[in-house]
A protein has these predicted regions:
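Aromatic-lined carbohydrate-recognition surfaces of secreted/lumenal glycan-active proteins
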Residues: 1-20, 71-101, 139-150
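Flexible loop/turn segments at secondary-structure boundaries
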Residues: 17-22, 44-49, 100-106, 149-155, ...
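Conserved, mostly hydrophobic/aromatic
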Residues: 38, 79, 98, 143, ...
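Aromatic- and acid-rich polysaccharide-binding/catalytic face
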Residues: 24-70, 92-93, 97-102, 115, ...
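Alpha-helical scaffolding within the catalytic cores
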Residues: 19-30, 128, 202-203
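The substrate-binding groove and active-site-proximal loops of carbohydrate-active enzymes
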Residues: 9-16, 56-73, 112-122
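Aromatic/acidic polysaccharide-binding cleft in carbohydrate-active enzymes
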Residues: 91-206, 215
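C-terminal beta-sandwich/jelly-roll accessory domains of carbohydrate-active enzymes
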Residues: 187-191, 196-201, 213, 221-295
Length: 295
């Protein structure tokens, strides 16, 4: 109940993963007077009984997590389609109340505290996920990574009076240019990466927005461990005058920040995007996240 001029934002317990029947039944019975949103719960975990190490993993384990992370887009599309049938006026939102990676806890830590390290693999998952969320904002109103500090795919890790920022934090900071901006549709026909054991994921992920000053920001993720990807950004009405960017990438996908080396994984300036007429050409290194600012 609302008191003292405050208004509660009420979120109904929604589905876990691909439980579309749950969403169907909920939407048959909910009204905007009862709730503001339904929550979707999904982690990028291929095997719950064998989550694996956060820092020691082979290529197949890497691509299995990418495959799982990419599943988020299909989940959002399917749940949204159900909600559209019952709520075409978009009065009930969809929120992702928990998402992210989940591995075995770090050796020597309490199993109930879910403390795990955070590598470039997690940065790629963060970038892929945020790009997906950007595309779905008509219905999707909130997406909460789990969690902020010292738990699962955290932004920061602490030890006494020491603190470090994780690769996931850096992706979130790079992507903050999309906040309060207007989503700009872009057409990219993604190819597919297929691992030796049949794991699949899109070969590139792209999302674009325009801020209140008219500046375009393009976030790009290349999840391939082995191949750089050439990309041409072609604009119908804009003739770009300048482009600059940041990149998050390292030589080893297992790289992570420690209290002894807290800046091993950190963004750097990216000057590899070149303007040619109405196009911008660039090469996205393997296993990297890039955000461009285009004026």
């Amino acid at each position: 109940k609302n008191f003292a001029g405050n208004r509660l934002y009420r979120v109904a317990c929604g589905p876990s993963g691909a439980d579309y029947h749950w969403t169907e039944v909920m939407m048959q019975n909910l009204t905007p007077a009862l709730t503001d949103a339904i929550a979707l719960h999904f982690y990028s975990v291929p095997e719950w009984n064998n989550k694996g190490s956060a820092t020691e993993f082979d290529d197949d384990a890497y691509y299995s997590v990418m495959d799982c992370a990419n599943e988020m887009e299909q989940l959002l599309k399917m749940h949204t389609a159900i909600m559209e049938r019952y709520d075409p006026e978009n009065k009930i939102a969809l929120v992702v109340d928990e998402w992210g990676t989940w591995y075995d806890v770090e050796p020597g830590t309490h199993p109930g505290y879910l403390y795990q390290q955070n590598t470039m693999r997690d940065a790629i998952v963060a970038g892929l996920s945020l790009n997906i969320f950007n595309k779905m904002t008509r219905r999707l109103q909130m997406a909460n990574i789990a969690q902020m500090v010292n738990v699962l795919q955290a932004m920061a890790l602490t030890d006494g009076d020491r603190m470090l920022l994780t690769p996931t934090y850096h992706v979130f900071r790079m992507y903050n240019v999309h906040q309060d901006a207007l989503f700009v549709p872009s057409d990219y026909k993604a190819g597919e990466i297929v691992s030796e054991t049949g794991r699949r994921c899109a070969d590139l992920s792209v999302s674009t927005s325009r801020d209140r000053h008219g500046v375009l920001h393009v976030s790009i993720v290349n999840p391939s461990l082995a191949k750089a990807k050439k990309l041409t950004l072609a604009f119908d009405k804009l003739k770009p005058a300048s482009v600059e960017g940041e990149i998050l990438a390292t030589d080893d996908i297992h790289d992570h920040n420690t209290f002894e080396n807290s800046e091993l994984v950190a963004p750097k300036a990216f000057d590899g995007a070149k303007i040619k007429g109405r196009n911008i050409n660039l090469t996205i290194p393997a296993a990297s996240v890039i955000v461009l600012e285009i004026k």
